Amino acid sequence: MSFELPALPYAKDALAPHISAETIEYHYGKHHQTYVTNLNNLIEGTAFEGKSLEEIIRSSEGGVFNNAAQVWNHTFYWNCLAPNAGGEPTGKVAEAIAASFGSFADFKAQFTDAAIKNFRYHWTWLVKNSDGKLAIVSTSNAGTPLTTDATPLLTVDVWEHAYYIDYRNARPGYLEHFWALVNWEFVAKNLAA
C-alpha cells in the first residue's frame, strides 16, 4: 500500500486573502506532495510498507520518520484551517483554554508569541497533555506530538514555505491572518477524542 496526498478539505483559493492559492499550490502541491513521494520511495520493500502513517511515525527514525511525520503534520495543519472560520472557540474548547491559560486572549497571545519566536523549531502546537491540561509546544523539523503522550489539537506551520510567498519575512503578519482561519470545529473533535 502506498500513501497518497490527502485531498484538501477546501478549494486551493478558499483561504484567500489570508493564504493565497499560490502559497497553497507550492505548500500543498509541491512540499506536501514531495513528502508523500519520498515516504513511498523510502518504505517500498521494507517492514514499514503496509503500516499506517501513525505506526510508521511511532516506530521509525531518519528519513522515513521525517517524511512520514511531515505528511501527517501537513495533513493535520490543512485540517486546522477553514474558510470563513476563525473567531473565538466556544463550548468545551473555550472552557479548556480558559482553564489552562486564563482566557482566550491570553492563549492567543502566548501561542502567537511562541510561533513568532519559533526560530529553532518549525511547528507550534496546542496539545492536551495526559493530565487533561492544555499546553503550547514547539517541535523542530518533522517533530510531532504523536511521539509523546500528548494529543494534538491545533498546529501552525512556521516553516518559511508556509508563508513566504504571501508575507515574505513577516511571520507576525502570517500569524495574525492564521487566526482568521482556525477551524475550531476540528479542534473540538481533537479535544473530544
List each language-model region with its residue ranges.
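Feature for soluble, non-membrane regions of globular proteins
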Residues: 1-193
